[in-house]
Amino acid sequence: MSEQYAALRGNVNLLGQLLGQTIKDAQGQAILDKVEEIRALSKSSRSGNENDRKTLIKVLHALSDEELLPVARSFNHFLNLANVAEQFHTVSRFNDVGFCQLNPLTQTLKTLATKANNGQLNHNHLADTLSKLHINLVLTAHPTEVTRRTIINKHVELSDCLASLERTDNLAQEREAILNRIAQLISQAWHTDDIRRSRPTPVDEAKWGYAVIENSLWHAVPRFLREFSQHVKEHLSLELPINYSPIEFTSWMGGDRDGNPYVTAQVTKEVLDHGRWMALDLYGRDLETLSTELSMSDASDELIALAGQEFEPYRCVIKTLKNQVLETVMHLGAKIKNQRSEAQDLITDINQIKHPIEVCYRSLLKCNMKVVADGLLLDVLHRLNSFGLRLAKLDVRQDSSRHGDVFSELTRYLGLGDYNQWQEQDKQAFLLTELNSRRPLIPKRWQPSPEVQEVLDTFDVIAQQDEQTFGLYIISMARTASDILAVQLLLKESGCSFKLPVAPLFETLDDLNDGHNVITTLLDNDWYRGQINNTQNVMIGYSDSAKDAGMMAAGWAQYEAMDKLVQLADKRGIELVLFHGRGGTVGRGGAPAAQALHSQPPGSLKGGLRVTEQGEMIRFKFGLPDVALQSLNIYAGAVLQSNLLPPPEPKPQWREVMALISEESCEHYRNVVRHDENFVPYFRMATPELELSKLPLGSRPAKRNPTGGVESLRAIPWIFAWSQNRLMLPAWLGALTGLQAALAKYGVETLQEMSLQWPFFRSRLEMLEMVFSKADSWLSEHYDNALVEDMYKPLGVTLRKELAEAISLVQSLSPQKSLLADQPWIKESIALRNPYTDPLNVLQVELLRRARSSDNGSEGDIDNALMITMTGIAAGMRNTG
């Protein structure tokens, strides 16, 4: 690595040395020597030494069954430690040259202040945009987090230790104690099972999400709001109100039942109880501290009236509130455990906590104790506004076909025919008639099938809660207006007393292209306009559209869908909230946050940002308070910049170019993935797709249809499999064909102009550059040589040739003629991990060969080592699905 990353390199070396000592103590010198030999060969191979590459393959293939597991674990642990060091480096005091050297939010506010002072930006517009800033981060349980929570907790403490080591005033014995603690944590992690032995339940996943909030975001959000307010005051001379709350959290964990039969109505109720229990427990801890701190006696009349004639009115109010909170915590704890309890459910509304806290705050201000008011008390108010009574609201998601099945059974029971066989106009007419009717539709004596009853039970759970509990009801695979109206009718039939926003999820190429027509049909209806409170939520699917059409075509379809929806919303005078269902990988829409937001159509963030944070990306972006603070700054700065300094409207010719790229790339992608009869057998042989099912990643099954082929495979295992063999195919297949067609028709100058002036197109190329830097043809070829039958090998040769040509073409479009020249941090990050990921790939090939051979089967150490290579490669790639 270059000298500018010396601090990072030093931490990586330190952790690596201590891991080496752990391996020696646990496995013996011989295993450590073998690991060091493999590491040296891998580094030499990365430098271009072909002989050492061949030796590396030979050494790894010659490992005995007894050596497989410790060697695989060694490289897996090193990659996890490298990730700890890298994540810490982003917030290290020595990071003066990384991608985060300056607070991106501060830089944005400075730019806005300059433009406002120069008359380029209207002050009122600036203040209004700030007041409407809204960022909703949606934590999802997509099974891409492969690291066990117990290991993650040790890694969090390791990061704290690295921070302690940076202190310049450490005494020698203090430094020695820190190093000893690091050694203990590394040893603890080594002697802990790397792999979950059972799949997490939906409740387990929800607990994991709540733990991220408890350990990181609970601390980061008040800091963010405090610093944000200070920066706004300093740079823009604006005072933000104390109830200013631009950050909100939502969860899919326990609410996303699309394709997951384990998320039942009962599970959703249990998860809601868990969320309220944990939130109140955290508030209880804050109230305990406040009751110690707020010992003052000077108080406002408002507080005295609330406290009575108490000598210490603040303590009186806080202690009363604390006791109510703790009693509710006891009640919920017993309920979760199915135990009886005398404790009562006292706190059921957030205002029961917020009101007395606000009274205390106002009293302190009135009594000239602002410095006290702006301490923990203000932090608690910020938490109440951001986390509410359940830490995160819950989204409910279900496939559109499940709602159709409800009405299909019901209409057949009522003698009206089969709803699923009706024309779209007939469905809409039926649904709107029932929505406008005052009588119930569902007969009390009707006994639906268990599948339909489960859907109805979910709506009953929604109806039993208040409107602060849920975020959205999301309809996956939404295609028509009737899909949305069907959910509205089910909400009505359940007796839901509030207007829960319903969002269609447009996720295939055709559905994205037709999305604005669906919303137009809905907005043409008076009943619907009256139902939505002038706000329309639409979710844009990135994963399935990329799997359906390839990354280039999907990216353009997403852009056009958003652009048309923005224009429609402006024309109809409604607020549009676009919800981005991005994954961590390029193949599922992933990109650095600021880059992704700047590349969206102008006006697409006026309604705020709502975006999924999935799997391992939650840990990478929010796992530590300092890192979470940085991520919140990036999001806030990017949203403000996009709304106040929007990207340019693309020229008509640029749209023509993208339409051509989209059409040509999609056709080529589908010709390979859908129409080449050799593709599916090749995919199954060249990747560990079949073996991935043994890895207990998440509660949701890997396939929508267990007997189906690639088309039924979920986007996550589809991406995971290709990232394992380093071909990274879903993220680039078709790009070469599309770009070549554009070059032939429009010339290189046009594409270079687009790259320079249009953030959307530039982001497409930068995402390709990142993928190409992670892809590796020699490793893909090695998988093919060892695992693929001869008749299917030519396809692999063709794909690797296409990859090489695509890399060359994208490099030629870069001003520096090299990959990631403008993203040196990402380039260094990949280079840091490659020498440790490569051996795991080579080892995985050998393990797959042994596991698939009829003699060995896949048992014991081979099975364990194979799963460890999967988790290790995922750590090396820094994303899985």
From Swiss-Prot:
The active site is at H142, K547. SUPFAM superfamilies: Phosphoenolpyruvate/pyruvate domain. Signal peptide: none annotated. Its cofactor is Mg(2+). One of its GO terms (cellular component) is cytosol. It holds the Pfam family PEPcase. Disulfide bonds: none annotated. GO terms for molecular function: magnesium ion binding; phosphoenolpyruvate carboxylase activity. GO terms for biological process: carbon fixation; oxaloacetate metabolic process; tricarboxylic acid cycle. InterPro entries: PEP_COase (IPR021135), PEP_COase_bac/pln-type (IPR022805), PEP_COase_Lys_AS (IPR018129), PEPCASE_His_AS (IPR033129), Pyrv/PenolPyrv_kinase-like_dom (IPR015813). It catalyses: oxaloacetate + phosphate = phosphoenolpyruvate + hydrogencarbonate. Gene3D superfamilies: Phosphoenolpyruvate/pyruvate domain. It comes from the Bacteria. It is an enzyme of class 4 (lyase). Its EC number is 4.1.1.31. Keywords: Carbon dioxide fixation, Lyase, Magnesium. Belongs to the PEPCase type 1 family. PANTHER family: PHOSPHOENOLPYRUVATE CARBOXYLASE. Forms oxaloacetate, a four-carbon dicarboxylic acid source for the tricarboxylic acid cycle. This is Phosphoenolpyruvate carboxylase. It comes from Pseudoalteromonas translucida (strain TAC 125). The lineage of its organism: Bacteria, Pseudomonadati, Pseudomonadota, Gammaproteobacteria, Alteromonadales.
